[in-house]
Amino acid sequence: MEVCGDLKSDNLKNRPLTPLRILRGLMILLVFLSTAFMFLLYFAPIAALGLRLLSVQQSRKVVSLIFGLWLALWPYLFETVNGTTVVFSGDIIPVEKRVLLIANHRTEVDWMYLWNIALRKGCLGYIKYVLKSSLMKLPIFGWGFHVLEFIPVERKREVDEPVLLQMLSSFKDPQEPLWLALFPEGTDFTEEKCKRSQKFAAEVGLPALSNVLLPKTRGFGVCLEVLHNSLDAVYDLTIAYKPRCPSFMDNVFGTDPSEVHIHVRRVLLKEIPANEAESSAWLMDSFKLKDKLLSDFNAQGKFPNQRPEEELSVLKCIATFAGVISLTVVFIYLTLYSHSCFKVYACLSGTYLTFATYYKFQPSPGCFREDSCKVKNH
């Protein structure tokens, strides 16, 4: 049963793509791309290179503060500008600094709605994703993914496991905030992928799931193996949309979705087996539950145990947009109309970001003396 299709039982409809929405969407794209570009050019060499050579922990704090400000534009766009309602259900989320988030992958923008949770809990700048490595090649955003230390994977176990182990080992400090997001299905849901998943499930004796794909368990196992003793909890999230699943451009133009429903199951680490085989079985059970939740959502139009969450402040939205845009205007002025040293700085910064992203270069204190920087051969 396809949850991404229109829900006939609701009166919600996708908003029409009017000329005004097109104009507003193009302006939003311009604002988001230009602000991301200038923030990365001017802040990344200072926060993610210079400061990181002195202290990785302090560098991460500054990166979180600066780029968390920019990331906040997205939840404000979704909820305050577009008028999308985010409906939470299930367990209440306390303010916790170290969590592993696992979620179903309905569409290409699921991961962006996790920011709506992190913003409310004061951890927006600390959220990191395990994502497919091809996304690191995106112009501008690839730089951002690298600076924010997202973990790129090839979806090949023999290649990905050493990368996961290496990068996760740098996040083991229990005093350092970390929201690590993982989509165990490994790809977004489509009917064709679902049929292939069901065929494979039948061949290996696993349950046939209709609304999610079979999860890949090893990545989850590695995350638990490395971080088990330092995490506060696992947030098991199930995401659904009304009236249909949005694309990235739907979000930009504000046509879809009208509602995002996020069901939360907060699980303590002691409730998840440490043994790899048993933790894999736990994850499989989690996705069987997601499948049932999504079937019920399709029939009833909601998840059980809906609960209120604070609304995002309009004043904070205005202040965030004003602050980010004002800084961007200053950076553009410095680059184009001020002393030539700013042009040189911008060029060197862009060169460094391109190099660092391509070679997965993350500096650390003393790395040039001890040859300990993380650089991968291509």
Swiss-Prot record:
**What's a Gene Ontology MF term here?**
1-acylglycerol-3-phosphate O-acyltransferase activity
PANTHER family per record: 1-ACYLGLYCEROL-3-PHOSPHATE ACYLTRANSFERASE-RELATED (PTHR10983), LYSOCARDIOLIPIN ACYLTRANSFERASE 1 (PTHR10983:SF16)
Q: Top-down, what is the taxonomic lineage of the species of origin? A: Eukaryota, Viridiplantae, Streptophyta, Embryophyta, Tracheophyta
Q: Which reaction does it catalyse?
A: a 1-acyl-sn-glycero-3-phosphate + an acyl-CoA = a 1,2-diacyl-sn-glycero-3-phosphate + CoA
Query: What InterPro entries does UniProt report for this protein, alphabetically?
Result: Acyltransf_C, Plipid/glycerol_acylTrfase
Q: What's this chain's function?
A: May convert lysophosphatidic acid (LPA) into phosphatidic acid by incorporating acyl moiety at the 2 position. Has no activity when expressed in bacteria or yeast.
Q: What is known of its domains?
A: The HXXXXD motif is essential for acyltransferase activity and may constitute the binding site for the phosphate moiety of the glycerol-3-phosphate.
Membrane-spanning segments:
26-46, 62-82, 317-337
What single Pfam family name could you report for this chain, choosing any that match? Acyltransferase
Its encoding gene is what?
A: LPAT4
Compartments where located = Membrane
- Record family assignment: Belongs to the 1-acyl-sn-glycerol-3-phosphate acyltransferase family.
Which key words are in the record? Acyltransferase, Lipid biosynthesis, Lipid metabolism, Membrane, Phospholipid biosynthesis, Phospholipid metabolism, Transferase, Transmembrane, Transmembrane helix
Q: What is the annotated tissue distribution of the protein whose record heads this document?
A: Widely expressed at low level.
Q: Which domain of life is it from?
A: Eukaryota
**Predominant location:** membrane
Q: How does it sit in the membrane?
A: Multi-pass membrane protein
GO BP of this protein: CDP-diacylglycerol biosynthetic process
Q: Extract one GO cellular component term from the record.
A: membrane
> What is the name listed in the Swiss-Prot or TrEMBL entry for this protein?
Probable 1-acyl-sn-glycerol-3-phosphate acyltransferase 4
Motif mapping: HXXXXD motif = 105-110
* E.C. no: 2.3.1.51
- Please give the pathway this protein is involved in: Phospholipid metabolism; CDP-diacylglycerol biosynthesis; CDP-diacylglycerol from sn-glycerol 3-phosphate: step 2/3
